[in-house]
């Protein structure tokens, strides 16, 4: 039976982005008490749990390839009264990481979802950019190439709010060139 308040509860737990010291005390408490931890990568989550002194946790891999199948397993455990924590490799589950479809399925099945907030790459990038923070939008990763990428950039070119994008370091130079082509050289950009 669950040791978290509320049996059959799914808890999204934000994890550190690069600095394990950013794991909150509340996150450690929830992860310690969870009957099951759904995670993007069991090896990386194992390292995080070890750092926090958490042992004996039951882990279930939930990534972009397994999220749909894993949702059924999570719902079954919730229906048995288990508490399930969800983590990704870094940051908040569901933000350009697995979790969104899982949460939708759990809510549709009538279970409660809670969150332990914490590190968030979009917010960290936004506040350290020096760009306006009162109105902004999160776009995640752009399509990698072709018409989908060109089309998305054209849509974003008319956006007046600050736009937060994710990009891999190896594609950053090409993306900056594409942004300049779509938005013009006068639009400010910050890389965080």
Regions found by a protein language model. Name each.
Residues 39-40, 97, 166:
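Short beta-strand scaffold positions
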Residues 60-69, 142-146:
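Conserved helicase motor
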């Amino acid at each position: 039976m669950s040791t978290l308040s509320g049996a059959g509860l799914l808890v999204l737990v934000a994890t550190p982005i690069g600095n394990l010291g950013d794991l909150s005390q509340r996150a450690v408490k929830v992860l310690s008490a969870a009957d099951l931890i759904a995670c993007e990568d069991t090896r990386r989550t194992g390292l995080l749990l070890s750092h926090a002194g958490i042992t004996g946790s039951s882990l279930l891999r939930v990534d972009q390839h397994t999220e749909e199948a894993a949702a059924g397993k999570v719902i079954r455990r919730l229906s048995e009264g288990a508490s399930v924590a969800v983590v990704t490799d870094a940051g908040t589950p569901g933000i350009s990481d697995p979790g969104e479809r899982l949460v939708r399925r759990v809510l549709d099945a009538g279970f409660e979802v809670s969150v332990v907030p914490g590190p968030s790459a979009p917010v960290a990038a936004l506040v350290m950019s020096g760009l306006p923070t009162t109105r902004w939008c999160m776009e995640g990763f752009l399509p990698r190439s072709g018409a989908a990428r060109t089309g998305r950039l054209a849509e974003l070119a008319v956006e007046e709010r600050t736009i937060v994008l994710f990009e891999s370091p190896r594609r950053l130079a090409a993306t900056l060139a594409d942004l300049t082509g779509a938005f013009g050289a006068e639009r400010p950009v910050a890389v965080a």
